[in-house]
Amino acid sequence: MKFSEKWLREWVNPAIDTQALSEQLSMAGLEVDGVTPAAAKFNGVLVGEVVECGQHPDADKLRVTKINVGGDELLDIVCGAPNCRLGIKVAVATVGAVLPGDFKIKKAKLRGQPSNGMLCAFVELGISEEGDGIMELPSDAPVGTDLREYLGLDDNIIDVDLTPNRGDCLGIKGLAREVGVLNSIDVNVLQIPAVTATVDDKVSIELVNEDACPRYLGRVIKGINLDTATPLWMVEKLRRSGVRSIDPVVDVTNYVLLELGHPMHAFDLNAIEGGIKVRSANAGEELVLLDGNSVKLNESTLVIADHNKALAIAGIFGGEQSGVTNKTSDILLESAFFNPVAIAGQARSYGLHTDASHRYERGVDFALQHDAIERATALLLEIVGGEAGPVVEAVAADKLPKVTEVRLRRSRLDRVIGHHIEDEKVTDILTRLGFNVKVENDSWSADVPSYRFDVRIEEDLIEEVARVYGYNSIPNVAPTAKLKMTTHNEATIALSKFRNTLVARGYQEAITYSFVDPKAQAILHPESQPLVLPHPISIEMSAMRVSLMPGLLASLAYNQNRQQPRIRLFEHGLKFLSDENAENGVNQVPVIGGVITGLAHGEHWVEEKRNVDFYDVKGDVEALLAITNDMSRFEIKAEQSDGLHPGQSAVIYVAGKKVGFFGALHPQAQKSLDINNATFVFEIEMSAIEKRNLPQVAGVSKFPSNRRDIAILVQESVNIGDILTAIEKVGGNQLVDLNLFDVYKGKGIEPNYKSLAIALTLQSVDRTLEEKDINLVVDNVVATLAEQFNASLRD
């Protein structure tokens, strides 16, 4: 936002120069982007009056004038401007004056006529880049006065780059309040008396969409004269704020916007049929805007309409049909509060960005509408005349923002800032910022003013106190913290252990989104009910993941499409399960998962090339389980899991609870997800593997070990893991190693049976085992297998 420094100093005038003021604003969070002069450098230009104006005898486009600049003699000046005429006040560059560009005025003759000076245009004085003809000054401009002094051109234009949360400073009133607080001085409050209605004309107002517009004020002004020019003082303030003068009505609404920070709009009263309705746009409704462009309105767009048509896009842009023209004599003045949520993003959807939308998106003071309409009314009556009707207000009080009370604790303030600020200073800062403050028990209770949409929590108040107090005023103190050594639980396994294990086995860690494509997730987990986001980034990221598989498989497919022959990815993260008993109805479960496909090993002359299979992923899973030093508590069963191949999948159980799965991706799922080659996956809940059995110190036996091999026949459906578990239980302390070294099916074996060759290693720590001891253990093992699995020794 650009503004005139002199205009600001009319409201509050601290005893500091421009540079100090700019630095002060920047340090308070209102960053100054630049400071430029209000006009180019020139001197010797006075206010003059055209007392004679005649045609040049030898040139059709030139006029010979006599100008009164307050001296003893009139100045003869030849002028070519078409608007030069008798009686107007003008800017006169006298002989010796120096204009921008080091242009010096000298005595001259133009087509034989003497010219002792020059009548200046705005462009020639570097005041404006636009304008036709010479400057026309107000009729009450004092002749002979230095133009720089008269127009207050020894001024600076300050450009501040405000953050989106500081919409309250998008007006001179808000900026003055900030400067007053920063310098601990009072602000000259603008007194805005109510304008007495002199006519009874009014327009009915209906709030159809109360949530988007809870307050709307309208006032009829009749009999305005738009042939009147906008006063130069207002034109100059608008210019220095980067706003071009258009006509008196538009200029007044723009002036109020810049002064109070409140957007306004004026309608041609004769274009309004019936009354005003503030509603959402109808399907297919169109509107021709003031710039002549026609737009098709979205149904989510709030519009100002009469009983038959849309008149304007609320808070953004007016319509051409109801716009004020030079033929307008009666207007309806609008002053409204629009909910920032209703305006945010609407302007961009139509390719627009206006001063009004810029402010309404950030939040306009919802208590300012009456002051704004009274201020605009008074200015209009002063400039263009007319008669004002009563202010008509439609309000949904329950839909207006509520006053928020925020508590600031002394302990919290000191801890965050790291410095003690006196109670009186804190109270003064908050009070000057407009907060209604109550001091109680080492804390402050502050009612947030209606113009501060950005203050909602305690940290917001701390920020306000700190920035006004001045960050440079807070002493530099090195942070101190007590370091308390935390005890390390040896039974807890660090996540890095699992990561390092997988990396050592050729995996690379991936990080995928928690938001996944619900269609892809349904392919892998058709029975799971996903948590659908109400406002997703995109349709492809609209569901919370119920496992890591959708994200990992999407990454695998991405890498396959880039010709990667060997892919091994793993991820640690959360899966999100719907659970009514959990906090917010969501159970967040930490898991670790992985996917593999392609070659089992990189190409090498020693090993033959082969693709990964079920036992590769099983080995990786067992490597993770082995970190717990308690493999016996895990039970692996051949069971089908969602999205996995029915003949190549397994489920991991701990104490009867499912804690993980692994296996081959189902061919149908593989095809649906555009994945080539056989792919294997695994996922384990971290709660099942994050604790380990601490290793117990035991002496190394000095007695010999004995190996006995047994070959048994069992039905093909018998789980080998169950057999090994049973042997471990019956083997006792003397069984120190157990190994399945052969599985055979085929010739010599009955159909539906398999042969298992198992090596038992027996050893004692206190004696040499005798043959009878060894046979006793082996016989117990064989008997147990026969009893539990109907196993028999193979001949």
Swiss-Prot record:
Signal peptide: none annotated. Coiled coil: none annotated. It catalyses: tRNA(Phe) + L-phenylalanine + ATP = L-phenylalanyl-tRNA(Phe) + AMP + diphosphate + H(+). Mg(2+) binds at D454, D460, E463, E464. Its EC number is 6.1.1.20. This is Phenylalanine--tRNA ligase beta subunit. Its main location: cytoplasm. Tetramer of two alpha and two beta subunits. Transmembrane segments: none annotated. GO terms for cellular component: phenylalanine-tRNA ligase complex. PANTHER family: PHENYLALANINE--TRNA LIGASE BETA SUBUNIT (PTHR10947:SF0), PHENYLALANYL-TRNA SYNTHETASE BETA CHAIN AND LEUCINE-RICH REPEAT-CONTAINING PROTEIN 47 (PTHR10947). Residues 701-794 form the FDX-ACB domain. Belongs to the phenylalanyl-tRNA synthetase beta subunit family. Type 1 subfamily. HAMAP family: Phe_tRNA_synth_beta1. It comes from Pseudoalteromonas translucida (strain TAC 125). GO terms for molecular function: ATP binding; magnesium ion binding; phenylalanine-tRNA ligase activity; tRNA binding. InterPro entries: aa-tRNA-synth_II/BPL/LPL, B3/B4_tRNA-bd, DNA-bd_dom_put_sf, Fdx_antiC-bd, Fdx_antiC-bd_sf, NA-bd_OB-fold, Phe-tRNA-ligase_IIc_bsu, Phe-tRNA-ligase_IIc_bsu_bact. Residues 39-148 form the tRNA-binding domain. Residues 401-476 form the B5 domain. Keywords: Aminoacyl-tRNA synthetase, ATP-binding, Cytoplasm, Ligase, Magnesium, Metal-binding, Nucleotide-binding, Protein biosynthesis, RNA-binding, tRNA-binding. One of its GO terms (biological process) is phenylalanyl-tRNA aminoacylation. It is found in: Cytoplasm.
